[in-house]
Design a protein with these regions (language model features):
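N-terminal leader/signal peptides at the extreme start of proteins
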Residues: 1-12
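Short coil/loop residues immediately preceding or within conserved phosphate-binding loops
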Residues: 9, 21, 117
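A short, glycine- and basic residue-enriched loop/turn
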Residues: 9-11, 24, 65
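Alpha-helical hydrophobic helix detector
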Residues: 18-34
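Conserved hydrophobic/amphipathic alpha-helical signal-anchor segments
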Residues: 37-78
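Extracellular/periplasmic head regions of type IV pilus-like filament subunits
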Residues: 63-131
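Short, surface-exposed interaction loops/tails
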Residues: 114-186
Length: 186
């Protein structure tokens, strides 16, 4: 007499295990791209938040001293997929701004020749595709539609209307710069 006839078998068949593995694979194929996009959105928020903080610091400095302060590209290395220490190479310490910890983006403020208008921008290649993502804030001269009396600020990634190779022509808002500078929305 066979002693296994009265006992029921416990466990999963190979087919059942293969179905579970296939379902997990499908879920991973859906979840991983969404997770990567979520990470890129989180990295992007650093640039937007810090541009807004620079704007606040510039306005506070202007209300006290009547002039805006230029900020050299800081950190001097290009923004990338990895965080780097923020090193102020000029200007940001004067207005009292420094980001917390390390940063993905590099930041710059260019002022008009009469120091009554400025453009702040942030740039980084956070997705590693070789093209920088750029965010900016354009503060025009009082009552004006261009930055500065003559409408020039020199070379900067994100520029306003009336400036050669204009990109972001909306004033007083933190917005993505010209789309040719990389994907700004994920």
């Amino acid at each position: 007499m066979n002693k296994f006839l009265g006992k029921s078998r416990k466990g999963f068949t190979l087919i059942e295990l293969m179905i579970v593995v296939a379902i997990i694979g499908i879920l991973a194929a859906i979840a991983i791209p969404n997770f990567i996009r979520f990470q890129l959105k989180a990295k992007t928020s650093e640039g937007k938040v810090n541009i807004a903080a620079i704007r606040t610091a510039e306005e506070a400095y202007f209300s006290e001293f009547g002039t805006y302060v230029a900020g050299s590209v800081s950190p001097a290395t290009n923004g990338s997929t990895a965080k780097v220490p923020f090193v102020d190479v000029g200007g940001f310490g004067t207005i009292g701004w420094s980001p917390e910890g390390q940063v993905y983006f590099n930041y710059e403020v260019v002022i008009s020749t009469n120091a009554v208008a400025y453009v702040a921008d942030a740039g980084a290649d956070i997705d590693g595709n070789g093209t920088d993502q750029a965010w900016g804030y354009v503060h025009p001269a009082p009552g004006g539609t261009t930055v500065g009396e003559d409408g020039t600020l020199g070379a900067i990634v994100c520029v306003g209307a009336g400036i050669p190779s204009g990109g972001n022509d909306v004033f007083n808002q933190v917005l993505p710069c010209d789309p040719s500078y990389g994907q700004s929305e994920f």
